[in-house]
A protein has these predicted regions:
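Transmembrane beta-barrel domains of Gram-negative outer membranes and organellar outer membranes
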Residues: 37-272
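Bacterial N-terminal signal peptides
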Residues: 21-32
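N-terminal secretory signal peptides that target proteins for export/translocation
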Residues: 1-17
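Residue-level detector of alpha-helical hydrophobic segments embedded in or interacting with membranes
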Residues: 8, 29-30, 158, 173
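Hydrophobic alpha-helical segments, especially transmembrane helices
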Residues: 17-22, 270
């Protein structure tokens, strides 16, 4: 018995080293798994339009996913399938080229695993070419800083940098947002590339129809395989008026990283 114990004691350092190596390997493999784009409170391509100087604008974003991921996208995440998101976006026109924004609250009134939740808030600074709708070529840059609950994002603090470039080729609009997102880990190579594209046809001054594409390619240093990427194609209709602006759309996921079917509705108006 004493001989067996002696052998066991002599082997303990090797066992500990092996266990440590196994743990390190597991952590490395987990870190190497392709990231999947989390749910979003805002499904929109920015066109460099901002609130007029001195105006306060309120936009309500509502997204419903009747057919989506039935498992959490990360441990503890809200399940997308049958979930409903609602966000209030407040905007103030500071100058003809700068708009200050606040998303409060970012919420999920319903999800199958959490019920109703408050998901966090975002602060936004949007810089654009003044009176972008009057120019053939327009541009802008949007920055967002988010504070998230653990079930909305797997990191508490995240940010978005959204360049805006576009053309008004009346009656067509072509707009591209080459977005990069960060959770402040992993350096520049870990920035997530999540671009969006909109091609719109303006039927009249008040009605437009559009095709939109939203993508999530993964980190810049190594895009995830195509079948694991986030790729959603959308059909959208817009209606503008003096009292309220409406955008509604239906999106279909075309890759394994996207939800199969999502609806969006956006309502906005100036409050002063």
């Amino acid at each position: 018995m004493n001989l067996k114990m002696a052998r066991y004691e002599s082997a303990r350092p090797k066992l500990r080293a092996r266990a440590f190596r196994l743990c390190c390997t597991a952590i490395a493999l987990t870190a190497a798994l392709p990231s999947v784009r989390a749910q979003t409170d805002e499904i929109q391509v920015y066109d460099a339009a901002i609130a007029e100087q001195g105006k306060v604008n309120l936009m309500i974003h509502m997204n419903f996913t009747p057919i989506g991921w039935k498992t959490p996208r990360f441990p503890g995440a809200i399940i997308a399938n049958d979930s409903f998101q609602a966000t209030a976006e407040w905007a103030y026109g500071v100058t003809p080229w700068f708009e200050q924004g606040l998303y409060m609250p970012v919420s999920s009134p319903h999800s199958t695993n959490y019920g109703g939740t408050f998901d966090g808030f975002k602060i936004r600074e949007l810089f654009v070419r003044p009176h972008a709708d009057e120019h053939t070529f327009f541009y802008g840059l949007n920055f967002e800083f988010s504070v998230n609950h653990h079930y909305w994002e797997d990191r508490t603090y995240t940010s978005e940098l959204r360049p805006i470039v576009g053309l008004h080729l009346k009656p067509w609009d072509i707009i591209f947002n080459p977005i990069v997102d960060t959770d402040y880990t992993g350096g520049p190579g870990n920035l997530q590339f999540n671009p969006s594209l909109r091609v719109a046809y303006n039927i009249t001054g008040r009605w437009a129809v559009a095709a939109e594409q939203y993508a999530g390619f993964g980190p810049l240093h190594h895009f995830v395989p195509v079948n694991q990427q986030f790729q959603e194609s959308w059909a959208v209709v817009d209606r503008t008026s003096k009292t309220i602006n409406i955008e509604a759309g239906v999106g279909v996921g075309v890759t394994g990283g996207a939800d199969r079917l999502t609806f969006k509705l956006m309502l906005s108006r100036d409050l002063n």
